[in-house]
UniProtKB/Swiss-Prot annotation:
<feature type="binding site">
    <location>
        <position position="408"/>
    </location>
    <ligand>
        <name>[4Fe-4S] cluster</name>
    </ligand>
</feature>
<comment type="similarity">
    <text>Belongs to the ThiC family.</text>
</comment>
<keyword id="KW-0949">S-adenosyl-L-methionine</keyword>
<dbReference type="GO" id="GO:0051539">
    <property type="term" value="F:4 iron, 4 sulfur cluster binding"/>
</dbReference>
<keyword id="KW-0862">Zinc</keyword>
<dbReference type="InterPro" id="IPR037509">
    <property type="entry name" value="ThiC"/>
</dbReference>
<feature type="binding site">
    <location>
        <position position="411"/>
    </location>
    <ligand>
        <name>[4Fe-4S] cluster</name>
    </ligand>
</feature>
<feature type="binding site">
    <location>
        <position position="264"/>
    </location>
    <ligand>
        <name>substrate</name>
    </ligand>
</feature>
<feature type="binding site">
    <location>
        <position position="415"/>
    </location>
    <ligand>
        <name>[4Fe-4S] cluster</name>
    </ligand>
</feature>
<dbReference type="Pfam" id="PF01964">
    <property type="entry name" value="ThiC_Rad_SAM"/>
</dbReference>
<dbReference type="GO" id="GO:0009228">
    <property type="term" value="P:thiamine biosynthetic process"/>
</dbReference>
<dbReference type="GO" id="GO:0008270">
    <property type="term" value="F:zinc ion binding"/>
</dbReference>
<keyword id="KW-0411">Iron-sulfur</keyword>
<feature type="binding site">
    <location>
        <position position="332"/>
    </location>
    <ligand>
        <name>Zn(2+)</name>
    </ligand>
</feature>
<keyword id="KW-0456">Lyase</keyword>
<keyword id="KW-0004">4Fe-4S</keyword>
<feature type="binding site">
    <location>
        <begin position="225"/>
        <end position="228"/>
    </location>
    <ligand>
        <name>substrate</name>
    </ligand>
</feature>
Length: 426
């Protein structure tokens, strides 16, 4: 029986109780959120790890994408990325591998990860066909659903499935309508398959089949935004909104089937449109948790997209987004390395925390109050402990060699805090 089914029966599961304790909420509040579809607790029946909740009233969570590519595939390197992401504070990792031994990478991640694990099953289908020198055109619905069921059986806690890329919605993302067209890998593959076969998306057409698989393993469905805008000029257009309408209907069907579901969101979005996008998703999707990539607030900052993503992520979280997918400095440029992973997680955590303060999530200000008290006391060790990233501030201060231990090299003897402390505590 799934978490949703138990919640609807009034049962507080072990996972719900654990989430309630970590969030400082009552178990009943978490149970009611799960029953209503406003909270998900991803966790495959075949995996055991500390459960984490995503959704309304909870702290904003952060995901880190790792995984190979056709041009770069090293299982050991992906393991180091996994370790780096978790050490930096990621609540989730997604294996987005598309090259090399995909099974070996996924097996390693599922065995080694102490946090929830997600993936995009259609990538495996595409990679296998490519390895056999076959076009994605040759994919059959059975091949796709077989991959989904196999990966769920292996232990994935949630899967991204681009069910909302219908023929009607994909047509609205044509080259004559958008600057960048379709920028989602899964979305573009399905759009091309539908175009070539003149058939509907099997994930949409056979959604009940997908629900059956997800329910069997209590896998959370992350309904992918295959038509997300890849340019700020494309944001909030017909294709994006049509897909969101479809996802709202599918989310309702998932809840009716006692399957946990969350919705993925844009993308590249001007900062003034982010709040409206979040509100629209919540309204159309019945309050389902919103999982956003960024959003990136400008297109012209390659190499710094962890910053554009953090800006958008903070605004989205403040408006009600629940789950931030990190963006790294390598976005749009290359496969992320270990340093990119660490920087991306920290940037997303800063965005999530900033959003939580704005949302007035219980306890969100505690860390800031701790940091401020330590700054007032010139307690440098305490400042390091209160920092989202304790390592970098310690490194920077120790490398600067201040003449006086109580101050830093920015102000030295002119330290405002020291001056005020001397005035108020003579």
């Amino acid at each position: 029986m799934t978490q949703v089914a138990r919640a609807k029966q009034g049962v507080v599961t072990e996972q719900m109780a654990a989430v309630a304790k970590s969030e400082g909420l009552s178990p009943e509040a978490v149970r009611d959120g799960v029953a209503a579809g406003r909270i998900v607790i991803p966790g495959n029946v075949n995996r055991r790890f500390a459960p984490v909740g995503i959704g309304s009233g909870l702290r904003t969570k952060v995901n880190a994408n790792i995984g190979t590519s056709p041009e770069h595939h090293d299982v050991a390197e992906e393991e180091r990325k996994l370790q780096t992401a978790v050490a930096a504070g990621a609540h989730s990792v997604m294996d987005l591998s598309t090259g090399g031994d995909l099974f070996a990478v996924r097996k390693m991640v599922l065995e080694k990860s102490p946090v929830m694990v997600g993936a995009v099953p259609i990538y495996e289908v595409a990679a296998r066909l490519s390895a056999e020198s076959r076009a994605f055109y040759e994919m059959t619905p059975d091949m796709l659903f077989d991959a989904i069921e196999r990966q769920c059986a292996e232990g994935l806690d949630y899967i991204t499935v681009h069910c909302g890329v219908t023929r009607q919605a994909a047509a609205l993302a044509g080259a004559d309508r958008r600057v960048t067209g379709i920028v989602s890998r899964g979305g573009s593959l399905l759009a091309a398959w539908m175009h070539d076969h003149r058939k509907e998306n099997p994930l949409y057409e056979e959604f009940d089949r997908l629900l059956g698989i997800a329910a069997a393993y209590d896998v959370t469905l992350s309904l992918g935004d295959g038509l997300r805008p890849g340019a700020v000029a494309d944001a909030s257009d017909g294709a994006q909104l049509q897909e969101l309408v479809v996802l709202g209907d599918l989310a309702r069907r998932a809840r009716d089937a006692d399957v946990q579901v969350m919705i993925e969101g844009p993308g590249h979005v001007p900062i003034d449109q982010i709040g409206a996008n979040v509100q629209m998703q919540k309204a159309l999707c019945g309050g389902a948790p919103f999982y956003v990539l960024g959003p990136l607030t400008t297109d012209c900052a390659p190499g710094y997209d962890h910053i554009t993503g953090a800006i958008g992520g903070a605004v989205a979280a403040a408006a009600g987004a629940d789950f931030l997918c990190y963006v790294t400095p390598s976005e749009h440029l290359c496969l992320p390395d270990i340093d990119d992973v660490r920087v991306g997680v920290i940037a997303a955590r800063i965005a999530a925390h900033s959003g939580d303060i704005a949302k007035k999530v219980p306890g969100a200000l505690d860390r800031d109050m701790q940091m401020s008290a330590c700054r007032k006391a010139l307690d440098w060790r305490g400042m390091y402990q209160a920092a989202i990233d304790p390592c970098l501030p310690r490194q920077r201060r120790e490398a600067s060699h201040p003449e006086e231990e109580s101050v830093c090299t920015m102000c030295g003897e002119l330290c405002a805090v020291k001056t005020h402390n001397r005035m108020t505590n003579p």
